[in-house]
Amino acid sequence: MAVTMRQMLEAGVHFGHQTRFWNPKMAPFIFGHRNKIHIINLEKTLPMYNDALKYVRQLAANRGTILFVGTKRQSRDTIAEAAQRAGMPYVNARWLGGMLTNFKTLKVSIKRLKDMEAAVEAGELEKMSKKEALLFEREIAKLQKSIGGVKDMGGIPDAIFVVDVGYHKIAVTEANKLGVPVIAVVDTNHSPEGVDYVIPGNDDASKAVALYTQGVADAILEGRANAVNEVVQAVRGGDGDEFVEVNGEA
């Protein structure tokens, strides 16, 4: 379902930051200011948001992986819920330096987490002393919080979706180094540089964050559904072909 400009207004997408904190590189996307707060031009935001979703659909249709990134308090739960619904990896605690550029090290931690989870399933905790079990539980909880959202990410993602590029500067920089496309919400106090699909908008309001993330999750599911429908149509199209038996005898 397409998002309307009214929905963006109701979610507060148009509210930027205080004018004294603005980044001049966001000037093309600013409508004006009110009470020393920049107002984002939604006539620019809406088509750019739709362009980003179009790219997301295409990527999902081709079985691409999109990593959701949002570690700010007001976006953590929303990011996790949307990513899980779309079957995509996510980072909603803290971005660990090297998550992309040093993926080999991350894989070691992921293996450790999976091994520990398997041990819990096998009832290994019951064989430990109270102290050992406590230390084990602390470690697994720490790993689940930091990398639980990426434990099923088999490799470098095909794109990352970021809410607040300033807060997640390291993630954007790592993606840029590896040539991984960046889809991001950029507020008036940050630069859109390094972002392939810019969504000019409020990156603080929970309603606005929910609108972006739910839209991206929906686009992923739509892209996958479209790909499945195309396969079904192709198979059905072949049913109508006349079957001709080839006789090998001369």
UniProtKB/Swiss-Prot annotation:
Keyword Hydrolase: no
Entries under PROSITE patterns matching the protein: RIBOSOMAL_S2_1
Ribosomal protein keyword on record: yes
Gene3D superfamilies (alphabetical): Glucose-6-phosphate isomerase like protein, domain 1, Helix hairpin bin
An example Gene Ontology CC term for this record: cytosolic small ribosomal subunit
Example GO BP: translation
Pfam family, one: Ribosomal_S2
Keywords, comma-separated and alphabetical: Ribonucleoprotein, Ribosomal protein
UniProt-recorded name of the protein: Small ribosomal subunit protein uS2
Species lineage: Bacteria, Pseudomonadati, Pseudomonadota, Betaproteobacteria, Burkholderiales
